[in-house]
Swiss-Prot record:
Domain annotation Carrier: ranges: 3-81
Native organism: Streptomyces rimosus
Reported modifications of this chain: 4'-phosphopantetheine is transferred from CoA to a specific serine of the apo-ACP-like protein.
Keyword check for rRNA-binding: no
Transmembrane segments: none
Protein name: Oxytetracycline polyketide synthase acyl carrier protein
UniProt KW keywords: Antibiotic biosynthesis, Phosphopantetheine, Phosphoprotein
Annotated GO biological process: antibiotic biosynthetic process
Length: 95
């Protein structure tokens, strides 16, 4: 089973929605809110759909609302892949 990595997620974000020129996605962006990275809800819906298709998981309709940072989306995806619940440090912290 292949888990989603930050590098994988950033590639998917770029492919699904492009990259904001003023944002350096090469830096430490795991805990930066998607909106601060220049990605709106439509971009995230496209990315979540691609994750669901590529990784064979169902993240649910509220994935975009709950996963406000790359770390939270990665944890949510990998928890779904492994059958575990997302860690308290990810999605819960981002609320």
């Amino acid at each position: 089973m292949t888990l989603l990595t930050l590098s994988d997620l950033l590639t998917l974000l770029r492919e699904c929605a492009g990259e904001e020129e003023s944002i350096d996605l090469g830096g430490d962006v795991e805990d930066v809110a998607f909106d601060a990275l220049g990605y709106d809800s439509l971009a995230l819906l496209n990315t979540v759909g691609r994750i669901e298709r590529d990784y064979g998981v169902q993240l649910g309709d509220d994935a975009v609302e709950k996963a406000t940072t790359p770390r939270a989306l990665i944890e949510m995806t990998n928890a779904s892949l492994t059958g575990a619940s997302p860690s308290a440090g990810g999605a819960a912290r981002d609320k």
